[in-house]
Amino acid sequence: VDAFNETRSNGCLVLLSPIIKAPMAWNELIASWNVAPATNAVLEIQARGIYPDHETKFYTMGVWSSDRLARHSVGGQRDDDGRVKVDTLLTARAGADIQLRLTWSGAAAFPPVKFLGLSLLDNRATPETSPSQRAAWGKTIATPERSQHSYPQEEGWCSPTSLSMVLTRWSDLLHRPELNLDVPEVAQDVLDTNFGTGNWPFNTAFAGSFEGMRGYVARLSDISELENWIAAGIPVIISAPWHLLSPGRQATGAGHLTVCIGFTETGDVVINDPATNFQKGQQVRRIYKRQDVIKAWQESRNTVYLIYPETIPPDPFGHWDSQK
């Protein structure tokens, strides 16, 4: 954000980006951000499309704060140019460049934005399938196991439960006890008061609010990219409806978040599934058929949460942040 134009008015700090040349003809956009917690500070993240013949309005991608009562998505954003579905901007026409506007309010001082990312997708395209990355086959990453159903107050806590597992993995590896958070605490810290705990960039923003940690939403091309992360020793949260993870079931429209922790010797997927009922003898760690995971994951257009210390594996395709 160093190149953003900065203005101050009525206690607000407004950061306006230069026009960002899109690398592809996108029609779906998800914004991600990482900022340190700041008492009373509220950050509104907005994006608009810039076409050769006109500009769209600024759409609000989220209102973020460490104060749960001030943190929310914005509904009712629909016009001829596009609409916002909770955390995703869908445009009626592909091919826009992008401009971002960040507005801080509510405090005397504001923390720096330490990371800002955009995930762009052309939902009309069918990416070519890449060869399997067999270095990940037979590898499983030790990751704590937790169930959303262990908490009587839970309401669709698959996302914060998955996030709790991954953060605790990094807590153990980095010897950082502040990352070992129980599920209810994570649920409160990612809550979108208008939607619940499944707002994708709210989950990654919370993970990235910790010093030295990065978190953001990405869309991958196929399972080979997921294998790259597992081969690098990094568990990945994937958006894949639970009812499609087993064969013979039909889509219902309900989403689900799970943690991919590895692959079997034959390429099936090892998952920590938060939708586990211990009273029924179920286990968090499960093996799902490769093709079932691919089918379920495609429902979210291969959406993932990438959460790691601020170092990552090489990116051969330019689909994630590869700056060291």
Annotated model-derived regions:
Residues 103-200, 242, 251-253, 320-323:
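Active-site-adjacent structural segments surrounding the nucleophilic cysteine of cysteine proteases
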Residues 75-95, 228:
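Short, surface-exposed tryptophan/glycine-enriched loops
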Residues 1, 13, 21-24, 40, ...:
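Noncatalytic regulatory segments and standalone regulatory/sensor domains
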Residues 24-37, 100-102, 242:
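A short beta-strand element within beta-rich, extracytoplasmic domains
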Residues 2-12, 216-221:
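Extracellular beta-rich ligand/substrate-recognition surface
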Residues 41, 158, 256:
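Histidine-centered active-site/metal-ligand motif
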Residues 17, 177-323:
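Conserved active-site-adjacent core of cysteine acyl-enzyme catalytic domains
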